Amino acid sequence: MALLDDVKAVVVEQLDCDPAEVKEDSKFIEDLGADSLDVVELVMALEEKFDIEIPDEDAEKILTVADAIKYIENNA
């Protein structure tokens, strides 16, 4: 649960959205109003927060909060 909270905090900070809107199945672009630059900045913030490197080909597959959590769990 802590990982979910940490990822949500990064999403809220980067996308400047309402924390109540951020669910595991929230899509960054469709549900949270991000654009492609926002998503790039979000991925960079996740890399910094969790001390991981996310290659571009993997970053393109991270479309939801759950995708981000799964990637971090498998690569951190």
UniProtKB/Swiss-Prot annotation:
One of its GO terms (biological process) is lipid A biosynthetic process. One of its GO terms (cellular component) is cytosol. Pathway: Lipid metabolism; fatty acid biosynthesis. Keywords: Cytoplasm, Fatty acid biosynthesis, Fatty acid metabolism, Lipid biosynthesis, Lipid metabolism, Phosphopantetheine, Phosphoprotein. It comes from the Bacteria. The keyword Cell inner membrane does not apply. This is Acyl carrier protein. Its main location: cytoplasm. The modification O-(pantetheine 4'-phosphoryl)serine is found at S36. It is found in: Cytoplasm. Carrier of the growing fatty acid chain in fatty acid biosynthesis. 4'-phosphopantetheine is transferred from CoA to a specific serine of apo-ACP by AcpS. This modification is essential for activity because fatty acids are bound in thioester linkage to the sulfhydryl of the prosthetic group. It comes from Aliarcobacter butzleri (strain RM4018). Residues 1-76 form the Carrier domain. Pfam families: PP-binding (PF00550). The gene is acpP. Belongs to the acyl carrier protein (ACP) family.
